[in-house]
From Swiss-Prot:
Protein name per UniProt: Elongation factor 1-alpha
Superkingdom of origin organism: Eukaryota
Species of provenance: Microplitis croceipes (Braconid wasp)
Keyword Protein biosynthesis annotated: yes
Family: Belongs to the GTP-binding elongation factor family. EF-Tu/EF-1A subfamily.
């Protein structure tokens, strides 16, 4: 589930 958290941070940072 750590991967999802990392992706979430990347997505939020990309927005």
């Amino acid at each position: 589930a750590k991967e999802k958290i990392h992706i979430n941070i990347v997505v939020i940072g990309h927005v």
